[in-house]
Amino acid sequence: MVTSNVVGWFLFSLCQLLVLVLSSGDGLAQAGSIKHSPSDVVKRYVELDHKGARLDAMSAETVASYTGWNEEPAWGHVVVTRGFVVAEQYRQWEVIDRLEVIIPVTFQVIGSVYLETAGFVQQVETEEVRFRVKGVKNRWKIVEPMLPPHVGQKRMVNFVREALVKETDPTKRERLGVLQEELRKAKE
């Protein structure tokens, strides 16, 4: 026997879900829909990468829907950045045809972390990467380039801190501590 409280709760929950769906508009639209700008796909991919989404296998799946490749190689290093700018206006792009464009992204790079040695090489530069985006099955997909993770400085410091907490080997802990300090002090 179903009580009126259960039915009331169910209807209330259903109404909340309906309000959420109706109020979200484009929020529930398929990521990378061809109806939206291809720069939206590039911007979202680069934002997620900046936040460290490609640093581990579990979170790397969040960016996979934006790319034309299924797997990435095991990168030996991570590019550490201060920020990035995506060219959002079509006049700044190279338009190949209706379903293919090249969108430039400018990164403010401060250096690279080499994962095997836990070493940081500071190399301040502005890097321009040209993302080729194609319309594939009614979705925009980044088809090239496949580049190493470009992670923000703060996120990289936190990533190293997490590794330091988990590490049990005293020598590796010391090296991670040095790396964390180098990353904190890195300047433009």
Where are these regions (language model features)?
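Low-complexity, intrinsically disordered terminal/linker segments enriched in charged
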Residues: I34, P38, V42, V46, ...
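Sec/Tat signal peptide C-region and signal peptidase I cleavage site
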Residues: G25-A29
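Core segments of small alpha/beta cavity-forming domains
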Residues: Q30-G83, P170-E174, V178-E188
